[in-house]
UniProtKB/Swiss-Prot annotation:
Top-level taxonomy: Bacteria, Pseudomonadati, Pseudomonadota, Alphaproteobacteria, Hyphomicrobiales
InterPro entries the record matches: MetI-like, MetI-like_sf, Phosphate_PstA, Phosphate_transprt_permease
Keywords, ordered alphabetically: Cell inner membrane, Cell membrane, Membrane, Phosphate transport, Transmembrane, Transmembrane helix, Transport
A molecular function GO annotation: phosphate transmembrane transporter activity
NCBIfam families on file: 3a0107s02c
Biological processes, Gene Ontology terms: phosphate ion transmembrane transport
Superkingdom classification of source: Bacteria
Protein name as it appears in the record: Phosphate transport system permease protein PstA
PANTHER family: PHOSPHATE TRANSPORT SYSTEM PERMEASE PROTEIN PSTA
Subcellular localization: Cell inner membrane
Membrane protein topology class: Multi-pass membrane protein
Length: 283
């Protein structure tokens, strides 16, 4: 009896120690997150004004805004999503619906996993060699292509996973009434997996909206307003990078404000994506 009691006490002490270590580790992580968000709010909110969204990036020593950088980020992100999403959805559909157990799917999944974990600067260098050097100049379209390449693996993985979660009974029911396979995929599988696929697209947007490295090698930057996709275009991440390293207080303040804008945008997209996932699980 005493042996059982002592064993219980020993396990209880070990459990308490491990729980304490887990709480401390979680607290350290949350503390760093709180410090980062606190610094962004403290320094970023000080520069928030209407001029940030209505004026162009200023020359050194002058006041201004981030209008052209915000516009450039939106344009390249939209193009990247438009290009990357269909490719990712179709590839994920093939892997889940047509070639689930094929060797080609295994190879594609392996390559996709590599792309998911590859540093974005490698994608930037690849597009630089593929487009920028042959064209002879930086361009917004090259930046959009780099972002599209970053979008594809995220959407592929999400689409495949969501379609694999669709019960086979639904597919069999569609096939039983004589529907072709592509109709079953479109009307049954896609409908059941829609919220999960949309979640993956939103997470892809959240990822590329803060990417700096691939745009440094492709779209570079532009201090002026530009709607020409065949010319360098400003973007918020690159502008933040440039302004944060400058010795000018006005530029540094705009860098903090731009960082706050990106952080809040990514946070909002992530929360919305999680809410979609939660609704799907409730159903």
């Amino acid at each position: 009896m005493s042996t059982a009691a002592s064993l219980h006490q020993s396990r209880k002490r070990k459990n308490g120690v491990m729980m304490m270590l887990c709480v401390v580790a979680a607290g350290i992580g949350l503390a760093w997150l709180a410090l980062i968000l606190g610094a962004l709010l403290y320094k970023g909110l000080a520069g928030v004004s209407l001029s940030v969204f209505t004026e162009m990036t200023p020359p050194p020593g002058d006041a201004g805004g981030l209008l052209n950088a915000i516009y450039g980020s939106i344009v390249m992100t939209i193009i990247g999503i438009i290009v990357g999403t269909p490719i990712g959805v179709l590839a994920g559909t093939y892997m889940a619906e047509y070639g689930r157990f094929s060797k080609l799917t295994t190879v594609v999944r392996f390559i996709n996993d590599i792309l998911l974990s590859a540093p974005s600067i490698i994608i930037g260098l690849f597009v630089y060699e593929l487009m920028v050097r042959p064209m002879g100049h930086f361009s917004a379209i090259a930046g959009a292509v780099a972002l599209a390449i970053l979008v594809i693996p995220v959407v592929v993985r999400t689409t495949e996973d969501m379609l694999n979660l669709v019960p086979n009974a639904l597919r069999e029911a569609g096939t039983a009434i004589g529907a072709p396979r592509w109709v079953v995929i479109r009307s049954v599988a896609y409908r059941a997996a829609l919220s999960g696929i949309v979640t993956g697209i939103l997470l892809a947007i959240a990822r590329i909206s803060g990417e700096t490295a691939p745009l440094l090698f492709t779209a570079l930057n532009n201090q002026f307003w530009s709607s020409n996709l065949n010319a360098p275009m400003a973007s918020l991440p690159v502008t933040i990078f440039q302004f944060a390293l400058s010795p000018y207080e006005e530029w540094q303040q705009l860098a903090w404000t731009g960082a706050l804008i990106i952080t809040l945008t990514v946070l909002a997209l992530s929360i919305f994506a999680r809410s979609l996932t939660g609704r799907r699980e409730d159903k």
